[in-house]
Amino acid sequence: VIHLDELRYDASWNVVSEEEFFAAQRKVVAGARWVVDGNGSASLPIRAAAADTIIVLDPHPLVCLAGIILRGLRYGGGQHPGGVYVRVNCEFLHYVVSYRRKTLPKVLRVLDEHAGHATVLHLTSRRSANRLIRELDDAERGHQ
């Protein structure tokens, strides 16, 4: 699993150039098997064109805010074990609250344009996400 933040920031958490960010994603999606976690709307066409499956996580904004609070308590606002630095500010909170209204329609348009070949799963609850994880886990165990 590649977190987009790992590609977007250097080791000192400085933003890399857009060209470097896009090139890093092209390198990842050129691989045979990959999972990318993150939104990165401007570079979504790169990932969408190469993906066979796209999972759009779209829980209610209050669920997202609760998750942000819990992560903040768990990691103290710093870097969690996965290496992603927790950045919470007013701009980020506004983005989360307005995501469904402002960003999601753009994401869905990009997917319509660039991911017609892919299976797109639009999950709107933790329950549906957990169900998918169980189904994938069961399918993986069935192939072993």
Positions of predicted regions on the chain:
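A glycine- and Lys/Arg-enriched "phosphate-lid" helix/loop adjacent to the NTP-binding pocket
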Residues: 59-103
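Short, hinge-like loop/turn segments at secondary-structure boundaries
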Residues: 17-22, 73-75, 139-140
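Alpha-helix boundary recognition
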Residues: 26-30, 48-49, 69, 97, ...
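Short secondary-structure transition/capping segments
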Residues: 31, 48-56, 81-88, 129-135
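Conserved nucleotide-sensing/catalytic segment adjacent to the nucleotide-binding pocket
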Residues: 2-59
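Short, charged, surface-exposed secondary-structure boundary motifs
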Residues: 11-15, 64-70, 131-133
